[in-house]
Amino acid sequence: MSYSGERDNLAPHMALVPMVIEQTSRGERSFDIYSRLLKERVIFLTGQVEDHMANLIVAQMLFLEAENPEKDIYLYINSPGGVITAGMSIYDTMQFIKPDVSTICMGQAASMGAFLLTAGAKGKRFCLPNSRVMIHQPLGGYQGQATDIEIHAREILKVKGRMNELMAHHTGQSLEQIERDTERDRFLSAPEAVEYGLVDSILTHRN
């Protein structure tokens, strides 16, 4: 997780997105695959967590809540992490909206990706069998006058403390345990993530 106000140069998304054609009473309609899955209340959080991606995910959640506030939303996560403020906008929206947000880790959920994974609705947080989860403390970098560096250092420590409190709340671990375990990168397999309380169970097949 990066606290720095600077944004990384992000790799462009794939230029070609598969299209799905549906037959309706009015003829054929075509959707890009993500729009079609959004109709099924599926949202993808993939790649670096940054402002543009976070805004899109927040907008999709609010749209799905407006469509049906009673039905679950399914958030699929495959992310190495990213900018804390962007991730926290997604986190706060997940907690704010009425529908439960079920989180599913596919591939990896590292750093802010892991934080959002464990923020899903209790009992509805999942890993696929070979996915990996990594937790650690926030990363930060700032250049400037000594006084400004001191201000930013105090701020990142506040952010670290708040994120540890939230992680403890969602996992059931003690705050002291979270502080110890996030001092350095800690990688967990799917079974270890279940044992730690980051997720509730492992999905092997659809019901």
From Swiss-Prot:
Main location: cytoplasm
Positions of the pro-segment in this chain: 1-14
A cellular-component GO term for this protein: endopeptidase Clp complex
Gene3D superfamilies, alphabetized: 2-enoyl-CoA Hydratase, Chain A, domain 1 (3.90.226.10)
One Gene Ontology molecular-function label: ATPase binding
One GO BP annotation of this record: protein quality control for misfolded or incompletely synthesized proteins
Pfam families: CLP_protease
Reactions listed under catalytic activity: Hydrolysis of proteins to small peptides in the presence of ATP and magnesium. alpha-casein is the usual test substrate. In the absence of ATP, only oligopeptides shorter than five residues are hydrolyzed (such as succinyl-Leu-Tyr-|-NHMec, and Leu-Tyr-Leu-|-Tyr-Trp, in which cleavage of the -Tyr-|-Leu- and -Tyr-|-Trp bonds also occurs)
Catalytic residues, chain numbering: 111 (nucleophile), 136
Subcellular location: Cytoplasm
Domain of life (superkingdom): Bacteria
Coiled coil: none
Keywords recorded for this protein, A-Z: Cytoplasm, Hydrolase, Protease, Serine protease, Zymogen
EC number in record: 3.4.21.92
Family as reported in the entry's similarity comment: Belongs to the peptidase S14 family.
Function: Cleaves peptides in various proteins in a process that requires ATP hydrolysis. Has a chymotrypsin-like activity. Plays a major role in the degradation of misfolded proteins.
PANTHER family, per database record: ATP-DEPENDENT CLP PROTEASE PROTEOLYTIC SUBUNIT
Quaternary assembly: Fourteen ClpP subunits assemble into 2 heptameric rings which stack back to back to give a disk-like structure with a central cavity, resembling the structure of eukaryotic proteasomes. Component of the ClpAP and ClpXP complexes.
Descriptive protein name: ATP-dependent Clp protease proteolytic subunit
Gene that produces this protein: clpP
